[in-house]
């Protein structure tokens, strides 16, 4: 059966400040979402992360965000759809320069943090993001949050002529609408390796998850986000890769 592509946010260090264990995670993922300088990263880190992805045969994705270094891109900004379109184009282009220097290309786009969440709530911001992708390269997929009702996003993507990849998360709790539970809520982030792997396998099989109110939730899963922030999360990524390799042999 087709399995979701494993993606991971990477290149999120900045200067001497280190974020994530990119070297340890890269061998186990299919796609690297590389920060483009607005919420994290700098030119040197962007290029080194692209080179690391090339070394391991991993697809490079642009990970654009609101201009919010202090808040790590997790704060919503009052931006118009045109402003979202322009800031995304700017960031995709910056990463593409690093990709060309390392013999590869940007393969998809995954917005970050508050921008990603705002796009899921506001169709006009999503339309702005889609215009950015179309202006840059109409063949690039755009990652969007999987929800319990993906039909409106699918309809807009068909109208605009954009390929959507619906994204799910192995280590996050969901509400009944299929939205991520706020990180401020208890239990929003899973830390137990077995629970993370079990959720990943459930999503890969197309089986229902249990939402935070106990209801069953069906989510489309073209790609699955994993994290490599610490040694425990890296171990979980390795375990998910092993589990997916087992599913591929079934």
From Swiss-Prot:
According to its UniProt record, this protein's enzyme class is: hydrolase
Keywords on this record?
ATP-binding, Hydrolase, Nucleotide-binding
Q: What Enzyme Commission number(s) apply to this enzyme?
A: 3.5.2.9
Q: Which domain of life is it from?
A: Bacteria
GO function term, MF aspect, one: 5-oxoprolinase (ATP-hydrolyzing) activity
Please write the reaction equations for the catalytic activity of this protein: 5-oxo-L-proline + ATP + 2 H2O = L-glutamate + ADP + phosphate + H(+)
| A biological process from GO | carbohydrate metabolic process
Q: Spell out where the chain crosses the membrane.
A: none
Among the Pfam families in the record, one is LamB_YcsF
Flavoprotein among keywords: no
The family this protein is said to belong to: Belongs to the LamB/PxpA family.
Known role: Catalyzes the cleavage of 5-oxoproline to form L-glutamate coupled to the hydrolysis of ATP to ADP and inorganic phosphate.
Q: How does it assemble?
A: Forms a complex composed of PxpA, PxpB and PxpC.
Put simply, this protein is called 5-oxoprolinase subunit A
Organism classification = Bacteria, Pseudomonadati, Pseudomonadota, Gammaproteobacteria, Oceanospirillales
